[in-house]
Amino acid sequence: MYKELALALGLGTVVALVFLKKRKSVLKAHDGWWGVGACHQGPEDDSIRPFKVETTSEEIEDLHRRLDQTRSFPSLEDSQFNYGFNSKYLEKVVSYWRNDFNWRKQVDKLNKYPHFKTKIEGIDIHYVHVKPKSLAEGTRAVPLMMVHGWPGSFYEFYGIIPLLTEPSSPDDITFEIICPSIPGYGFSEAPHKKGFDGVCAAHIFNKLMKRLGFNQYYVQGGDWGSLITTNMAQLEPNAVKGLHINFAPPGKAGLLMMLSILFGRRFPKLFGFTEHDVKRLFPTMEKLVVDAIRETGYMHIQSTKPDTAGRGLNDSPVGLAAYILEKFSTWTDPEFKNLEDGGLERKFSLDDLLTNVMIYWTSKSIISSMRFYKENFSKGLNQPHAKLPVYVPSGVASFPNELMHSPKSWVTQKYHKLKTYTPMARGGHFAAMEEPQLLAEDVQSFVKIVEKRKKK
């Protein structure tokens, strides 16, 4: 047993050394055209236009009419959220949405920060741009792009923005925040051509930062945002000074990873596993296979026929809310599925949850947001970006209730300049919205380390 293990580790070390000696590669991307019809000839319109979220009485009346006409269907007895969104609690959500939720007030809240649009590669890109109100003499704001995922939106960052642009400690870094909407999400125009994946989004977001005058900047993301920001770093390693993510799913399974799966439970220290790593990874079949199948049904639908399922969600606000909010329950804490209310109001307010739903509803973006899965997965799992390491300074905030867990030893196989890996005290998938203070502190710690090392 021990001889076999030693031999396997020796082979793994040789493979790793050969891999690391390869010349550093940069991900390649080409300009695309995602607008309607043929590519526009001539220079691209690079104007930046102020934008405001708006609503009308007709829009609100249409919503109320649809809420009034919803058809309820009873959940099974004693099923809680194990079959999906519990119908009894959904009735409470719909009642609050219809009678108490003030969309006009939430629109004003959305507009508390400046919004803009600019056209890149044929489509309008929406983003929120927040500059610090004041800066101490001799200091500068550090540009940071924060990218959301599905089924979130730029609104996820409204709680963390003031913590980063107006830090309470004079020792903290003051940030200038840019929060774009992924094309096809919220108020960014949806691509009109097939093939728009994470690399394409990353290429556009790097262009956006350059258009805003930033030659170097930091990026942060969770869910799809982690893929997009990772791709941004792979595309422009000289522009992206640092990458911070709070979602680091396991990468391509190499020999060392396979060995750690086979022997890590018995020899955790040999593979750098902590007690939490062992708890999240083993037994392997249950944690890495069964749990994944149980929670990824939506992914199979959206990766194959997004337009079919999306049509019903685009027509029914109640269906849309159930589909989105069920993820805010289970992905925040898997144990919440055993609660009648899904634990939703333990971590979030209904106003915040419904505001995120309303961004999808009013922008009619649920179908185009779901297509992003098909565009990424239909190209296969062996894409260049999946095989290419990240060479820019990176930081990972590992939240205990995240959907998928990657031990530090796995993360370093992808992110070769990992500066921080923080096991967080609490929190799940929607970290910026659920635990803005914890995430802000980790971003601060990471950027301070990178900035300090840059000065040496």
Task: Report the location of each language-model feature.
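C-terminal subdomain of alpha/beta-hydrolase-fold enzymes, centered on the catalytic histidine
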Residues: I301-K456
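Conserved hydrolase catalytic core segment
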Residues: Y2-E4, L17-K24, L163-T174, L212-P268, ...
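Alpha/beta-hydrolase
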Residues: T13-V18, H40-K52, T56-E59, A239-Y360
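Alpha/beta-hydrolase active-site loop
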Residues: K193-R211
